[in-house]
Every structure is written in C-alpha cells, then in structure tokens.
Amino acid sequence: MVVAVYPGTFDPLTRGHEDLVRRASSIFDTLVVGVADSRAKKPFFSLEERLKIANEVLGHYPNVKVMGFTGLLKDFVRANDARVIVRGLRAVSDFEYEFQMAGMNRYLLPDVETMFMTPSDQYQFISGTIVREIAQLGGDVSKFVFPSVEKWLTEKVAAMAQGPSA
C-alpha cells in the first residue's frame, strides 16, 4: 500500500488544490492532505478552520485523509508511513523553491520520493494569496473556490471588517 502526503497551508483550499487531490488520490492507495500550522506565514484562517474547510471539500474522497500538523514535514511523513510527498507546481517560478525543498526532503528522508504535479490548465493561475486578496477587496472568487469555501471567506472578511471584537 503506497501512502502519499500532500502538504500545504491551504489558506484557503482552492479548486486547484482539489484538482491535485482528485488526481493524486487516483494514483495512491492513501493520500494524506497535511494542513500545516504555518504560523510564520500568518494564515488568514486558523488551523482549525482550514481543517474544517478541507474536510468539507475533500471529505467525499474515500482514500483521502485530512490532518493538521506542526513542526517538520519529515516527522509528519514518517508518522503517516508515507513513501511519497506530492507537491503542486503552478508555474516555473514555483520550481526553484520546490526543487530546493525536494532536495532537502531527500536528504532528511532518503527513502521518500517527491512527486511534482501541475494543475489542470484552468487552475494554473490560482493561488490562495490571490484568492484571499480578491475576497478582501469584495471581488468574486466563485470560479476559484468551492461554494463552501466562498462562504467561509465571506464570513471571515465580514468579521474582520467589524473589528477585533467580532
């Protein structure tokens, strides 16, 4: 049984992320979507919120597990007995960073492979950062995220507009 880990912040989970999950889950026996705590990135959604969102969008895949993690990816990969790390590449600009990370992961986890996947054409330009920015400026994000994610974004933006006591 081959287990793969698809790690990310998923802040928020986009149609591009789901596209990779759908395709990777057809390749591996189990795909663990690892939602990283990533406090250094100052996420828009809390880890708990991102886990709920990911479960709402991905819960129908029978061989996909959504799990949060903190700390090093290598420890999460080992804890899940994964043999493969799945990473998405949207553009050539992603490649240099991802290539460096794959090299480091190979050093830390010599028996684990990194597999790069590119999104389907219609999702190549989508990023969580851009989706958040559009949502915060009142734009339509419905083509980039699922309806449940759009609802989470709308509610979060409204709560932020009301101030810290909201």
Curated annotation (Swiss-Prot):
GO terms for molecular function: ATP binding; pantetheine-phosphate adenylyltransferase activity. CDD domains: PPAT. It is found in: Cytoplasm. ATP binds at residues 6-10, 17, 88-90, 98, 123-129. Keywords: ATP-binding, Coenzyme A biosynthesis, Cytoplasm, Magnesium, Nucleotide-binding, Nucleotidyltransferase, Transferase. One of its GO terms (cellular component) is cytoplasm. It catalyses: (R)-4'-phosphopantetheine + ATP + H(+) = 3'-dephospho-CoA + diphosphate. Transmembrane segments: none annotated. Its main location: cytoplasm. The record marks 17 as: Transition state stabilizer. InterPro entries: Cyt_trans-like (IPR004821), PPAT (IPR001980), Rossmann-like_a/b/a_fold (IPR014729). Substrate binds at residues 9, 41, 73, 87. GO terms for biological process: coenzyme A biosynthetic process. Its cofactor is Mg(2+). Pathway: Cofactor biosynthesis; coenzyme A biosynthesis; CoA from (R)-pantothenate: step 4/5. Its EC number is 2.7.7.3. Pfam families: CTP_transf_like. Homohexamer. PANTHER family: PHOSPHOPANTETHEINE ADENYLYLTRANSFERASE. Reversibly transfers an adenylyl group from ATP to 4'-phosphopantetheine, yielding dephospho-CoA (dPCoA) and pyrophosphate. Belongs to the bacterial CoaD family. This is Phosphopantetheine adenylyltransferase.
